[in-house]
């Protein structure tokens, strides 16, 4: 049930209102942090004298933090209000960046990464909650997630440039921490009316204690969740290990490798901005679009595997990002059509929670494979993940056809 908004809240739905611009900035900062982290992995490995398998622990602890916030966000928002919740997230984000910047022992680096994961989980969840309550929420949420891609596009360029200038890998985290400060100030000043607990949604759920149980009984929800599990594994594994792959396996220089990774995130961003609209004009259903995107990912990965040229790698990773871009938001958008209306919100929450496991598990496995067999394994590994994801998406579509004769669009 949507909250009835005041005139002031309706005005905040404007694309250029300060609070929406702050939300875009927050998501861009999350993307900037994620995009930069992959470029910094070799520097962390050298500085702390740890291998790729140990570095994979960074993904596990970060995702643990995100996962904890995904399951406790309702209670925290109810207790703190949305403003307090977002302020908490910005502070945790800042603490995590400061921890990395100080170059502490590796055990404390893991704690800093946990703080970053908690902070990212709060900022993403809180801003999604706010924007989803506004008019034009569908369009605004699409733009919101696209700005993550904008940040992820800039992140590798910033990080690789700083490394190229020999400013030290920790300088990247001081920059990120500095950017957290205006976000924190914005949450304090612009969310003053969001100190109350969120209405209706939690109260409704209290009266329907079996909502999550009912959600878990629906097979198509599990299939969609498993699709997103593997999708996130593909996206994050490539986003974080492509730079190391280009350095170690293709012997590219650091600056070019950073630009190629940025091209991957640029493709992801552009895919979210344009692919769905283009498909709609061409009367291609969202289901068919995802099939086509998955095939494009496999073709691009094979192309990079077989042709060892920098230009092919650059174009291939950009195409992969472009093809991956719309899959996550389209799956979330289709979910209410797959389940009864009463449990749609619960189903979406379950999908997001399961996808976080993919964010932790698959990049870690990529690191283990890179350490044991070499970074060349990244491409066949992601091809295998994409094939499995294709199978789960086929199952989602055909389970839906069994449930209803209506077409998924």
Regions found by a protein language model. Name each.
Residues 285-331:
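C-terminal transmembrane helical hairpin of 12-TM major facilitator-type secondary transporters
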Residues 37-38, 219-262, 269-270:
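Extracytoplasmic gate region of multi-pass secondary transporters
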Residues 49, 81, 102-107, 251, ...:
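Helix-breaking motifs and short loop linkers at transmembrane-helix boundaries and internal kinks
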Residues 338-377, 381-382:
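A late C-terminal transmembrane helix in Major Facilitator Superfamily
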Residues 112-149:
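Cytoplasmic helix-loop-helix junction between adjacent transmembrane helices
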Residues 69-81, 272-285, 370:
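Helix-to-loop junctions at the C-terminal end of transmembrane segments
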Residues 68-107:
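Conserved MFS/SLC helix-loop-helix module at the cytosolic interface between two early adjacent transmembrane helices
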Residues 137, 143-195:
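Helix-loop-helix hairpin linking two adjacent transmembrane segments in secondary transporters
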């Amino acid at each position: 049930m949507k909250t009835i908004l005041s005139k002031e809240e309706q005005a905040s739905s404007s694309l250029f209102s300060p609070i929406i611009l702050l939300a875009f900035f927050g998501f861009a900062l999350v993307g900037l942090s994620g995009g930069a982290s992959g470029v910094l992995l070799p520097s962390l490995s050298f500085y702390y004298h740890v291998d790729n398998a140990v570095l994979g622990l960074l993904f596990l602890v970060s995702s643990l933090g995100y996962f904890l916030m995904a399951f406790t966000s309702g209670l925290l928002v109810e207790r703190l209000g949305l403003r307090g919740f977002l302020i908490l997230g910005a502070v945790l984000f800042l603490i995590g960046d400061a921890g990395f910047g100080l170059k502490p022992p590796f055990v404390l680096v893991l704690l800093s990464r946990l703080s970053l994961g908690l902070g990212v989980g709060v900022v993403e969840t809180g801003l999604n909650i706010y924007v989803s309550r506004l008019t034009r929420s569908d369009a605004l949420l699409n733009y919101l997630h696209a700005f993550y891609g904008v940040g992820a596009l800039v992140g590798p360029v910033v990080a690789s440039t700083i490394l190229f200038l020999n400013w030290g890998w920790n300088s990247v985290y001081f920059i990120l921490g500095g950017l957290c400060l205006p976000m924190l100030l914005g949450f304090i000043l612009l969310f003053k009316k969001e100190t109350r607990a969120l209405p209706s949604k939690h109260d409704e759920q209290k009266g329907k204690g079996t909502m999550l149980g009912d959600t878990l009984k629906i097979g198509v929800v599990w299939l969609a969740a498993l699709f997103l599990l593997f999708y996130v594994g593909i996206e994050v594994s490539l986003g974080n290990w492509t730079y190391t792959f280009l350095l170690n396996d293709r012997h590219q220089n650091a600056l070019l490798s950073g630009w190629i990774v940025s091209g991957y995130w640029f493709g992801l961003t552009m895919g979210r901005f344009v692919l769905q609209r283009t498909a709609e004009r061409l009367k291609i259903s969202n289901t068919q679009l995802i099939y086509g995107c998955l095939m494009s990912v496999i073709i691009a990965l094979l192309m990079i595997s077989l042709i060892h040229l920098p230009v092919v790698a650059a174009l291939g990773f950009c195409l992969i990002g472009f093809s991956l871009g719309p899959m996550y938001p389209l799956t979330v958008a289709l979910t209410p059509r797959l389940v009864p209306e009463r449990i749609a919100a619960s189903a979406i929450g379950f999908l997001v929670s399961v996808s976080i496991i993919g964010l932790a598990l698959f990049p870690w496995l990529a690191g283990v494979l890179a350490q044991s067999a070499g970074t060349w394994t990244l491409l066949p590994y992601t091809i295998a993940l994409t094939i499995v994801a294709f199978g789960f998406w086929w199952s989602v579509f055909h389970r839906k056809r069994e449930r209803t004769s209506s077409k998924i669009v």
